[in-house]
Protein backbone atom coordinates (compact mmCIF):
# COMPACT_ATOMS: atom_id res chain seq x y z
CA UNK A 1 0.00 0.00 0.00
CA UNK A 2 1.16 3.47 -0.78
CA UNK A 3 -0.63 6.56 0.49
CA UNK A 4 -0.66 8.70 -2.65
CA UNK A 5 -0.53 12.77 -2.74
CA UNK A 6 3.60 -4.80 6.70
CA UNK A 7 4.32 -9.50 6.63
CA UNK A 8 2.27 -12.42 7.56
CA UNK A 9 4.41 -14.25 10.11
CA UNK A 10 4.76 -17.99 9.72
CA UNK A 11 5.20 -19.14 13.33
CA UNK A 12 8.62 -20.49 14.14
CA UNK A 13 7.05 -23.54 15.72
CA UNK A 14 5.27 -24.54 12.52
CA UNK A 15 7.78 -23.41 9.94
CA UNK A 16 10.12 -23.76 12.50
CA UNK A 17 21.23 -26.85 -3.67
CA UNK A 18 24.46 -28.97 -7.20
CA UNK A 19 23.84 -29.04 -10.92
CA UNK A 20 20.63 -30.70 -12.05
CA UNK A 21 21.15 -34.41 -12.01
CA UNK A 22 24.87 -33.89 -11.48
CA UNK A 23 27.21 -34.93 -8.73
CA UNK A 24 26.51 -33.92 -5.18
CA UNK A 25 28.90 -31.96 -3.08
CA UNK A 26 29.28 -33.73 0.25
CA UNK A 27 27.88 -37.16 1.04
CA UNK A 28 25.71 -36.93 4.13
CA UNK A 29 26.27 -40.59 4.93
CA UNK A 30 30.02 -40.24 5.26
CA UNK A 31 30.79 -36.56 5.78
CA UNK A 32 29.91 -34.11 8.50
CA UNK A 33 30.61 -36.07 11.67
CA UNK A 34 34.33 -35.64 11.41
CA UNK A 35 35.77 -34.04 8.31
CA UNK A 36 39.28 -32.70 8.48
CA UNK A 37 38.93 -30.92 11.82
CA UNK A 38 40.17 -32.56 14.98
CA UNK A 39 39.54 -29.91 17.61
CA UNK A 40 36.96 -30.41 20.34
CA UNK A 41 33.89 -28.40 21.30
CA UNK A 42 33.99 -25.51 23.72
CA UNK A 43 30.76 -23.80 24.71
CA UNK A 44 30.10 -20.74 26.76
CA UNK A 45 27.37 -20.09 29.23
CA UNK A 46 26.49 -16.75 27.67
CA UNK A 47 22.89 -15.79 27.17
CA UNK A 48 21.11 -14.97 23.96
CA UNK A 49 23.15 -11.87 23.30
CA UNK A 50 22.00 -8.62 21.77
CA UNK A 51 19.87 -8.55 18.70
CA UNK A 52 18.73 -5.40 16.99
CA UNK A 53 16.28 -7.20 14.75
CA UNK A 54 16.27 -7.14 10.99
CA UNK A 55 18.82 -4.69 9.76
CA UNK A 56 21.13 -3.90 6.93
CA UNK A 57 20.20 -1.97 3.86
CA UNK A 58 18.34 -3.83 1.20
CA UNK A 59 17.15 -6.87 3.14
CA UNK A 60 13.62 -8.07 2.85
CA UNK A 61 11.30 -6.44 0.37
CA UNK A 62 12.56 -3.05 1.46
CA UNK A 63 15.73 -1.30 2.48
CA UNK A 64 17.93 0.13 -0.23
CA UNK A 65 16.19 -0.13 -3.56
CA UNK A 66 12.51 -0.88 -4.08
CA UNK A 67 10.16 -1.40 -1.19
CA UNK A 68 9.39 -0.02 2.24
CA UNK A 69 11.50 -0.39 5.34
CA UNK A 70 11.49 -3.98 6.64
CA UNK A 71 8.01 -4.81 7.85
CA UNK A 72 7.16 -5.24 11.49
CA UNK A 73 6.44 -8.89 10.82
CA UNK A 74 10.06 -9.45 9.74
CA UNK A 75 11.10 -8.03 13.09
CA UNK A 76 8.55 -10.26 14.79
CA UNK A 77 10.20 -13.32 13.28
CA UNK A 78 13.63 -12.06 14.36
CA UNK A 79 12.32 -11.57 17.88
CA UNK A 80 10.92 -15.11 17.91
CA UNK A 81 14.28 -16.53 16.82
CA UNK A 82 16.06 -14.61 19.58
CA UNK A 83 13.46 -15.67 22.15
CA UNK A 84 14.02 -19.32 21.22
CA UNK A 85 17.73 -19.10 22.07
CA UNK A 86 18.95 -21.91 24.30
CA UNK A 87 22.56 -22.65 25.17
CA UNK A 88 24.84 -20.28 23.26
CA UNK A 89 28.24 -20.78 21.71
CA UNK A 90 29.64 -17.30 21.12
CA UNK A 91 32.09 -17.03 18.24
CA UNK A 92 34.24 -14.15 17.02
CA UNK A 93 36.46 -13.88 13.93
CA UNK A 94 39.97 -15.28 14.22
CA UNK A 95 42.91 -15.52 11.84
CA UNK A 96 42.26 -16.59 8.25
CA UNK A 97 40.08 -19.71 8.27
CA UNK A 98 39.60 -19.80 12.04
CA UNK A 99 37.27 -18.46 14.72
CA UNK A 100 37.76 -17.76 18.40
CA UNK A 101 35.65 -19.46 21.09
CA UNK A 102 36.53 -18.60 24.71
CA UNK A 103 40.12 -17.83 23.77
CA UNK A 104 40.59 -20.98 21.69
CA UNK A 105 41.06 -21.04 17.91
CA UNK A 106 38.90 -23.47 15.97
CA UNK A 107 37.18 -23.73 12.62
CA UNK A 108 33.57 -22.63 12.36
CA UNK A 109 32.86 -26.01 10.83
CA UNK A 110 34.06 -27.75 13.99
CA UNK A 111 32.09 -25.43 16.26
CA UNK A 112 28.88 -26.19 14.38
CA UNK A 113 29.70 -29.89 14.17
CA UNK A 114 29.96 -30.15 17.96
CA UNK A 115 26.82 -28.14 18.74
CA UNK A 116 23.96 -29.98 20.42
CA UNK A 117 20.25 -29.85 19.46
CA UNK A 118 18.79 -26.55 20.66
CA UNK A 119 22.14 -24.72 20.72
CA UNK A 120 22.64 -21.30 19.18
CA UNK A 121 25.95 -20.43 17.51
CA UNK A 122 26.15 -16.68 18.07
CA UNK A 123 28.37 -14.79 15.61
CA UNK A 124 29.98 -11.56 16.77
CA UNK A 125 30.42 -8.80 14.19
CA UNK A 126 33.22 -9.22 11.67
CA UNK A 127 34.27 -11.17 8.59
CA UNK A 128 34.75 -14.92 8.85
CA UNK A 129 36.97 -16.25 6.06
CA UNK A 130 36.21 -19.91 5.48
CA UNK A 131 39.34 -22.01 4.96
CA UNK A 132 40.42 -23.83 1.84
CA UNK A 133 39.88 -27.56 2.18
CA UNK A 134 42.68 -30.08 2.28
CA UNK A 135 42.75 -32.26 -0.86
CA UNK A 136 40.88 -35.07 0.91
CA UNK A 137 38.80 -32.99 3.33
CA UNK A 138 35.98 -30.49 3.65
CA UNK A 139 36.01 -27.03 5.21
CA UNK A 140 32.55 -25.52 4.76
CA UNK A 141 29.97 -25.31 7.55
CA UNK A 142 28.12 -28.64 7.40
CA UNK A 143 25.09 -28.96 9.66
CA UNK A 144 24.08 -32.48 10.67
CA UNK A 145 22.66 -31.68 14.12
CA UNK A 146 18.93 -30.87 14.16
CA UNK A 147 17.38 -27.79 15.74
CA UNK A 148 20.45 -25.59 15.94
CA UNK A 149 20.53 -21.89 15.15
CA UNK A 150 23.34 -19.88 13.58
CA UNK A 151 22.72 -16.16 13.88
CA UNK A 152 24.45 -12.84 14.38
CA UNK A 153 24.68 -11.38 17.86
CA UNK A 154 23.97 -7.86 16.62
CA UNK A 155 21.11 -8.75 14.30
CA UNK A 156 22.76 -6.75 11.50
CA UNK A 157 23.31 -9.03 8.49
CA UNK A 158 25.84 -6.66 6.91
CA UNK A 159 28.00 -6.64 10.03
CA UNK A 160 28.56 -10.42 10.07
CA UNK A 161 29.99 -11.89 6.86
CA UNK A 162 30.80 -15.52 6.11
CA UNK A 163 33.15 -15.19 3.16
CA UNK A 164 33.90 -18.24 1.04
CA UNK A 165 36.33 -16.08 -0.96
CA UNK A 166 35.94 -18.42 -3.96
CA UNK A 167 37.82 -21.14 -2.13
CA UNK A 168 37.38 -24.88 -2.57
CA UNK A 169 35.66 -26.39 0.48
CA UNK A 170 35.86 -29.98 -0.71
CA UNK A 171 34.20 -31.50 -3.76
CA UNK A 172 31.38 -29.22 -4.86
CA UNK A 173 30.36 -28.33 -1.32
CA UNK A 174 28.90 -24.99 -0.28
CA UNK A 175 30.05 -22.63 2.47
CA UNK A 176 26.86 -23.69 4.32
CA UNK A 177 25.24 -27.10 3.91
CA UNK A 178 22.04 -28.01 5.79
CA UNK A 179 21.56 -31.74 6.30
CA UNK A 180 19.46 -31.75 9.49
CA UNK A 181 15.93 -30.69 10.38
CA UNK A 182 14.84 -27.52 12.14
CA UNK A 183 17.96 -25.46 11.40
CA UNK A 184 17.68 -21.66 11.65
CA UNK A 185 20.03 -19.27 9.82
CA UNK A 186 19.49 -15.60 10.63
CA UNK A 187 21.06 -12.16 10.52
CA UNK A 188 24.29 -12.57 8.55
CA UNK A 189 25.77 -12.44 5.04
CA UNK A 190 27.24 -15.38 3.13
CA UNK A 191 29.11 -14.56 -0.06
CA UNK A 192 31.54 -15.44 -2.88
CA UNK A 193 31.10 -19.17 -3.38
CA UNK A 194 32.34 -21.11 -6.38
CA UNK A 195 29.27 -23.32 -6.04
CA UNK A 196 26.06 -22.72 -4.04
CA UNK A 197 25.99 -20.43 -1.02
CA UNK A 198 23.48 -22.49 0.99
CA UNK A 199 22.81 -26.10 0.02
CA UNK A 200 20.02 -28.29 1.39
CA UNK A 201 20.15 -32.07 1.46
CA UNK A 202 17.25 -34.43 2.08
CA UNK A 203 17.33 -34.17 5.89
CA UNK A 204 17.13 -30.38 5.86
CA UNK A 205 13.38 -30.12 6.52
CA UNK A 206 11.65 -27.25 8.35
CA UNK A 207 14.61 -24.89 8.09
CA UNK A 208 14.23 -21.13 8.45
CA UNK A 209 16.47 -18.76 6.49
CA UNK A 210 15.57 -15.31 7.76
CA UNK A 211 17.17 -11.89 7.28
CA UNK A 212 20.16 -13.40 5.49
CA UNK A 213 22.04 -11.73 2.63
CA UNK A 214 23.25 -14.16 -0.03
CA UNK A 215 25.71 -12.49 -2.36
CA UNK A 216 27.59 -13.74 -5.43
CA UNK A 217 26.88 -17.42 -5.76
CA UNK A 218 28.92 -19.15 -8.45
CA UNK A 219 26.02 -21.51 -9.06
CA UNK A 220 22.48 -21.13 -7.72
CA UNK A 221 22.63 -19.14 -4.50
CA UNK A 222 20.38 -21.57 -2.62
CA UNK A 223 19.95 -25.16 -3.76
CA UNK A 224 17.80 -28.07 -2.61
CA UNK A 225 18.94 -31.30 -4.18
CA UNK A 226 16.66 -34.29 -4.68
CA UNK A 227 15.28 -36.01 -1.61
CA UNK A 228 12.11 -34.10 -0.66
CA UNK A 229 13.38 -31.22 1.43
CA UNK A 230 10.13 -30.16 3.07
CA UNK A 231 8.80 -27.08 4.83
CA UNK A 232 11.65 -24.60 4.34
CA UNK A 233 10.89 -20.92 4.95
CA UNK A 234 12.95 -18.18 3.29
CA UNK A 235 11.92 -14.78 4.62
CA UNK A 236 13.06 -11.16 4.68
CA UNK A 237 16.31 -12.03 2.91
CA UNK A 238 18.27 -10.57 0.00
CA UNK A 239 19.87 -12.41 -2.94
CA UNK A 240 22.24 -10.21 -4.93
CA UNK A 241 24.79 -10.56 -7.71
CA UNK A 242 27.45 -7.84 -7.95
CA UNK A 243 29.57 -7.02 -10.98
CA UNK A 244 32.54 -8.80 -9.41
CA UNK A 245 30.38 -11.81 -8.68
CA UNK A 246 29.18 -11.89 -12.27
CA UNK A 247 32.78 -12.39 -13.40
CA UNK A 248 32.99 -15.52 -11.26
CA UNK A 249 29.76 -17.29 -12.20
CA UNK A 250 30.08 -20.98 -12.92
CA UNK A 251 30.31 -21.84 -16.61
CA UNK A 252 28.46 -25.03 -17.46
CA UNK A 253 28.25 -27.20 -20.55
CA UNK A 254 30.33 -29.15 -23.00
CA UNK A 255 33.85 -28.26 -23.99
CA UNK A 256 32.99 -27.48 -27.61
CA UNK A 257 32.27 -23.80 -27.19
CA UNK A 258 28.70 -24.18 -25.90
CA UNK A 259 29.57 -23.47 -22.30
CA UNK A 260 27.22 -20.92 -20.75
CA UNK A 261 26.56 -19.39 -17.35
CA UNK A 262 24.98 -21.46 -14.59
CA UNK A 263 23.64 -19.48 -11.69
CA UNK A 264 20.31 -18.39 -10.21
CA UNK A 265 18.62 -17.49 -6.95
CA UNK A 266 16.65 -20.31 -5.28
CA UNK A 267 16.59 -23.65 -7.10
CA UNK A 268 14.80 -26.70 -5.67
CA UNK A 269 14.33 -30.30 -6.81
CA UNK A 270 11.89 -32.75 -5.17
CA UNK A 271 11.10 -30.08 -2.58
CA UNK A 272 7.69 -29.61 -0.95
CA UNK A 273 5.87 -26.90 0.98
CA UNK A 274 8.46 -24.13 0.69
CA UNK A 275 7.42 -20.60 1.66
CA UNK A 276 9.50 -17.85 0.02
CA UNK A 277 8.32 -14.42 1.06
CA UNK A 278 9.22 -10.80 1.68
CA UNK A 279 12.63 -11.16 0.08
CA UNK A 280 14.48 -9.37 -2.71
CA UNK A 281 16.47 -10.69 -5.66
CA UNK A 282 18.74 -8.22 -7.42
CA UNK A 283 20.95 -8.43 -10.51
CA UNK A 284 21.10 -12.21 -10.90
CA UNK A 285 22.05 -12.45 -14.55
CA UNK A 286 25.10 -13.18 -16.71
CA UNK A 287 26.86 -10.69 -18.94
CA UNK A 288 28.14 -11.28 -22.47
CA UNK A 289 30.25 -8.12 -22.40
CA UNK A 290 33.79 -7.83 -21.13
CA UNK A 291 36.40 -10.53 -20.81
CA UNK A 292 35.72 -14.24 -21.14
CA UNK A 293 34.94 -15.80 -17.77
CA UNK A 294 36.59 -19.00 -16.56
CA UNK A 295 34.25 -21.95 -16.88
CA UNK A 296 33.59 -23.68 -13.57
CA UNK A 297 34.40 -20.58 -11.57
CA UNK A 298 37.80 -20.70 -9.95
CA UNK A 299 37.95 -24.48 -9.70
CA UNK A 300 41.14 -25.00 -11.71
CA UNK A 301 40.87 -28.78 -11.80
CA UNK A 302 37.46 -28.49 -13.51
CA UNK A 303 38.14 -25.67 -15.98
CA UNK A 304 40.44 -27.44 -18.42
CA UNK A 305 40.99 -24.15 -20.19
CA UNK A 306 37.28 -23.51 -20.84
CA UNK A 307 35.88 -19.99 -20.87
CA UNK A 308 32.48 -18.50 -21.65
CA UNK A 309 30.68 -15.20 -22.11
CA UNK A 310 27.09 -14.57 -21.11
CA UNK A 311 24.06 -16.83 -21.42
CA UNK A 312 20.66 -17.10 -19.76
CA UNK A 313 20.86 -17.59 -16.00
CA UNK A 314 18.29 -19.54 -14.01
CA UNK A 315 15.29 -17.84 -12.38
CA UNK A 316 15.49 -15.77 -9.23
CA UNK A 317 13.13 -18.41 -7.78
CA UNK A 318 12.71 -21.79 -9.50
CA UNK A 319 10.78 -24.70 -7.99
CA UNK A 320 11.27 -27.57 -10.42
CA UNK A 321 8.63 -29.90 -9.04
CA UNK A 322 6.20 -30.64 -6.19
CA UNK A 323 3.73 -33.54 -5.79
CA UNK A 324 -0.02 -33.14 -5.49
CA UNK A 325 -1.04 -31.45 -2.24
CA UNK A 326 2.43 -30.23 -1.33
CA UNK A 327 3.00 -27.09 -3.34
CA UNK A 328 4.86 -23.89 -2.61
CA UNK A 329 3.89 -20.34 -1.63
CA UNK A 330 5.88 -17.53 -3.27
CA UNK A 331 4.64 -14.14 -2.18
CA UNK A 332 5.55 -10.51 -1.63
CA UNK A 333 9.00 -10.71 -3.18
CA UNK A 334 10.75 -7.98 -5.18
CA UNK A 335 12.77 -9.19 -8.19
CA UNK A 336 14.88 -6.53 -9.90
CA UNK A 337 17.03 -6.90 -13.04
CA UNK A 338 17.31 -10.68 -12.87
CA UNK A 339 17.58 -12.89 -15.96
CA UNK A 340 14.24 -14.51 -15.16
CA UNK A 341 11.82 -13.96 -12.32
CA UNK A 342 9.76 -16.85 -10.94
CA UNK A 343 9.70 -20.29 -12.56
CA UNK A 344 7.54 -23.25 -11.59
CA UNK A 345 8.14 -26.70 -13.10
CA UNK A 346 9.69 -27.46 -16.47
CA UNK A 347 10.46 -31.11 -17.13
CA UNK A 348 8.47 -32.46 -14.16
CA UNK A 349 5.04 -31.71 -12.69
CA UNK A 350 4.55 -29.12 -9.99
CA UNK A 351 1.28 -28.90 -8.05
CA UNK A 352 -0.61 -26.48 -5.82
CA UNK A 353 1.63 -23.42 -5.99
CA UNK A 354 0.56 -19.90 -5.03
CA UNK A 355 2.39 -16.98 -6.68
CA UNK A 356 0.99 -13.84 -5.07
CA UNK A 357 1.82 -10.13 -4.74
CA UNK A 358 5.30 -10.25 -6.27
CA UNK A 359 6.95 -7.38 -8.17
CA UNK A 360 9.24 -8.26 -11.09
CA UNK A 361 11.03 -5.59 -13.10
CA UNK A 362 13.91 -5.29 -15.53
CA UNK A 363 15.59 -2.46 -17.40
CA UNK A 364 17.44 -4.76 -19.84
CA UNK A 365 16.84 -5.85 -23.41
CA UNK A 366 15.73 -9.43 -23.93
CA UNK A 367 18.70 -10.54 -26.05
CA UNK A 368 20.08 -13.82 -24.71
CA UNK A 369 20.50 -12.86 -21.06
CA UNK A 370 17.01 -11.70 -19.99
CA UNK A 371 13.71 -13.54 -20.27
CA UNK A 372 10.24 -13.95 -18.75
CA UNK A 373 8.99 -12.51 -15.45
CA UNK A 374 6.78 -15.41 -14.29
CA UNK A 375 6.57 -18.80 -15.97
CA UNK A 376 4.66 -21.96 -14.99
CA UNK A 377 5.46 -25.14 -16.90
CA UNK A 378 3.65 -28.46 -16.44
CA UNK A 379 1.86 -26.84 -13.53
CA UNK A 380 -1.30 -28.11 -11.86
CA UNK A 381 -3.77 -26.22 -9.66
CA UNK A 382 -1.59 -23.13 -9.57
CA UNK A 383 -2.70 -19.57 -8.80
CA UNK A 384 -0.85 -16.57 -10.25
CA UNK A 385 -2.56 -13.57 -8.70
CA UNK A 386 -1.91 -9.87 -8.10
CA UNK A 387 1.65 -9.78 -9.37
CA UNK A 388 3.17 -6.77 -11.14
CA UNK A 389 5.67 -7.38 -13.96
CA UNK A 390 7.10 -4.35 -15.77
CA UNK A 391 9.99 -4.19 -18.24
CA UNK A 392 11.27 -0.74 -19.21
CA UNK A 393 13.70 -1.46 -22.07
CA UNK A 394 12.16 -0.92 -25.52
CA UNK A 395 13.58 -4.27 -26.66
CA UNK A 396 12.69 -6.22 -23.53
CA UNK A 397 11.56 -9.83 -23.67
CA UNK A 398 7.95 -9.64 -24.93
CA UNK A 399 6.25 -11.85 -22.31
CA UNK A 400 5.63 -10.86 -18.72
CA UNK A 401 3.82 -14.07 -17.72
CA UNK A 402 3.85 -17.42 -19.53
CA UNK A 403 2.11 -20.74 -18.96
CA UNK A 404 3.52 -23.64 -20.94
CA UNK A 405 2.93 -27.21 -22.15
CA UNK A 406 -0.30 -29.08 -22.78
CA UNK A 407 0.03 -31.02 -19.52
CA UNK A 408 -0.59 -27.80 -17.59
CA UNK A 409 -4.03 -27.86 -15.94
CA UNK A 410 -5.97 -25.92 -13.33
CA UNK A 411 -3.90 -22.75 -13.66
CA UNK A 412 -5.58 -19.43 -12.81
CA UNK A 413 -4.04 -16.11 -13.85
CA UNK A 414 -5.92 -13.34 -12.05
CA UNK A 415 -5.43 -9.64 -11.27
CA UNK A 416 -1.91 -9.39 -12.68
CA UNK A 417 -0.53 -6.08 -13.92
CA UNK A 418 2.12 -5.98 -16.65
CA UNK A 419 3.23 -4.08 -19.73
CA UNK A 420 4.17 -7.29 -21.53
CA UNK A 421 2.13 -10.18 -22.91
CA UNK A 422 0.41 -12.83 -20.83
CA UNK A 423 0.95 -15.76 -23.12
CA UNK A 424 0.12 -19.44 -23.55
CA UNK A 425 2.90 -21.56 -25.06
CA UNK A 426 3.28 -25.16 -26.21
CA UNK A 427 -0.42 -25.96 -26.03
CA UNK A 428 -1.04 -24.81 -22.45
CA UNK A 429 -4.42 -23.61 -21.20
CA UNK A 430 -5.37 -21.50 -18.18
CA UNK A 431 -8.22 -19.49 -16.72
CA UNK A 432 -7.61 -15.74 -17.05
CA UNK A 433 -9.53 -12.96 -15.32
CA UNK A 434 -9.06 -9.19 -14.88
CA UNK A 435 -5.43 -8.98 -15.92
CA UNK A 436 -3.93 -5.81 -17.43
CA UNK A 437 -1.16 -6.29 -20.00
CA UNK A 438 -0.76 -2.74 -21.29
CA UNK A 439 0.45 -0.96 -18.17
CA UNK A 440 2.21 2.36 -18.63
CA UNK A 441 5.51 2.61 -16.70
CA UNK A 442 4.44 6.16 -15.83
CA UNK A 443 1.76 4.66 -13.55
CA UNK A 444 4.44 3.58 -11.07
CA UNK A 445 6.61 5.37 -8.54
CA UNK A 446 9.87 4.40 -10.29
CA UNK A 447 9.54 1.53 -12.74
CA UNK A 448 13.19 1.59 -13.83
CA UNK A 449 14.34 1.24 -10.22
CA UNK A 450 11.82 -1.52 -9.53
CA UNK A 451 9.36 0.41 -7.36
CA UNK A 452 6.11 -0.70 -8.98
CA UNK A 453 3.77 0.86 -6.47
CA UNK A 454 1.10 3.00 -8.04
CA UNK A 455 1.96 6.68 -8.25
CA UNK A 456 -1.70 7.68 -8.36
CA UNK A 457 -4.96 6.05 -7.34
CA UNK A 458 -6.64 7.50 -10.44
CA UNK A 459 -5.73 4.61 -12.75
CA UNK A 460 -9.21 3.35 -13.55
CA UNK A 461 -7.99 0.22 -15.32
CA UNK A 462 -6.27 -0.93 -12.12
CA UNK A 463 -7.81 0.55 -8.97
CA UNK A 464 -10.82 -1.41 -7.67
CA UNK A 465 -10.87 -3.32 -10.97
CA UNK A 466 -9.81 -6.76 -9.76
CA UNK A 467 -11.60 -10.01 -9.05
CA UNK A 468 -12.10 -11.10 -5.45
CA UNK A 469 -9.63 -13.91 -4.72
CA UNK A 470 -9.76 -15.71 -1.38
CA UNK A 471 -6.02 -16.35 -1.27
CA UNK A 472 -5.17 -12.65 -1.66
CA UNK A 473 -5.84 -10.87 1.63
CA UNK A 474 -3.00 -8.32 1.67
CA UNK A 475 -0.65 -6.59 -0.75
CA UNK A 476 3.12 -6.48 -1.07
CA UNK A 477 3.39 -4.16 1.93
CA UNK A 478 1.18 -6.34 4.16
CA UNK A 479 -1.64 -3.86 3.92
CA UNK A 480 -5.11 -5.40 3.82
CA UNK A 481 -7.05 -5.74 0.61
CA UNK A 482 -10.50 -4.62 1.62
CA UNK A 483 -13.49 -4.12 -0.63
CA UNK A 484 -12.79 -4.17 -4.36
CA UNK A 485 -9.27 -5.39 -5.12
CA UNK A 486 -6.76 -3.41 -7.12
CA UNK A 487 -4.95 -5.22 -9.92
CA UNK A 488 -1.26 -5.87 -9.30
CA UNK A 489 0.87 -6.22 -6.18
CA UNK A 490 0.09 -2.80 -4.68
CA UNK A 491 -3.27 -1.88 -3.12
CA UNK A 492 -3.43 1.87 -3.63
CA UNK A 493 -4.93 4.02 -0.89
CA UNK A 494 -5.65 7.74 -1.33
CA UNK A 495 -3.99 10.07 1.13
CA UNK A 496 -6.20 10.84 4.15
Q: Where are the regions that the model predicts?
A:
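Surface-exposed loop/turn segments connecting beta-strands in extracellular beta-rich domains
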Residues: 130-131, 158, 165, 171, ...
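C-terminal accessory segments
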Residues: 436-495
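Ser/Thr-rich, Pro/Gly/Ala-heavy low-complexity intrinsically disordered linkers and tails
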Residues: 3, 13, 17-74, 79
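Acidic Gly/Asp/Thr-rich repetitive segments characteristic of extracellular carbohydrate-active
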Residues: 74-124, 477, 481-482, 486
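Extracellular beta-strand/beta-solenoid scaffold signature
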Residues: 105, 109, 133-140, 164-177, ...
Amino acid sequence: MRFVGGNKWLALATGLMVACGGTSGEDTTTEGAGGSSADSATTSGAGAGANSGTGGEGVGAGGQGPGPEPAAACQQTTDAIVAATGNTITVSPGPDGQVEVEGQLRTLRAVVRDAMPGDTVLLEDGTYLLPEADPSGFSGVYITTPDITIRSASGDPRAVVLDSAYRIHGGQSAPITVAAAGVVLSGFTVRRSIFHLVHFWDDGDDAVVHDVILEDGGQQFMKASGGNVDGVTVSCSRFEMTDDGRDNVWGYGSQNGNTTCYTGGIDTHDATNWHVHDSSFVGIYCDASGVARPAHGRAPDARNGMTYQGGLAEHAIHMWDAPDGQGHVIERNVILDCARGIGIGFNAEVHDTLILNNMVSSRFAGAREHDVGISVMRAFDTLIANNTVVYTHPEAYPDGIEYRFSATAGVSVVNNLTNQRIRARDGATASLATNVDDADPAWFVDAAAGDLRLLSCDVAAVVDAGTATAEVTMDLDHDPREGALDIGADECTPAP
